Amino acid sequence: NILKNFIDIMYLRLIYDVLDNRAVNEHIAPAIQKLKTSEKDIDKVMEFTDNADLWNNHNVVVIDLSDVNTDTKKRIPLLISNKLYNEHKNQGRNTSHLNIIVDEAHNILSYQSTRESEEWKDYRLEVFEEIIKEGRKFGVFMTIASQRPSDISSTIISQLHNYFIHRLVNQHDIDQVNNTISYLDKVSVESLPI
């Protein structure tokens, strides 16, 4: 099956990256192990067929993760985003652009998670931080949406360039927005907790 082949490829990639000093086994091995243990959850989200193209001649792909557990909600975006980013990066100068949109980003890009090991959390955040910091060079962009900006990695928040701010009520979130957006005036900050 394609998922098993993917896991095998991930193991080979891990071995290659560790031998080449490009990855730390402790960061990647937990991700692969979690992937192996969550095949059923992944099957709820994705249907794997031979020679399948994620885009299938479409410009937009929506992956709905509402029916899976929290761990899978973190794994699927990580795996897909990392794969697409690396494909784009390896193509060199590419005229096409990729915009990865992460809704409920505070669930995926958070330091606050206590359900996972530190190594896995570090790896997950490192992947998304690289995409948001380096992706523009390769035509890869990220759009994130969240009701809890204070829960998102500060490295990721610091790389954002455009903001649509709606109603925020939590003081930590208001402070995060105020600290992140240097050009936000006092009147605008005071209007955030509408």
Stretches with model-predicted labels:
Residues R124-I194:
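Conserved ATP-driven motor cores of ASCE-family P-loop NTPases powering translocation/secretion/packaging/pilus
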Residues N1-E130:
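P-loop NTPase motor domains
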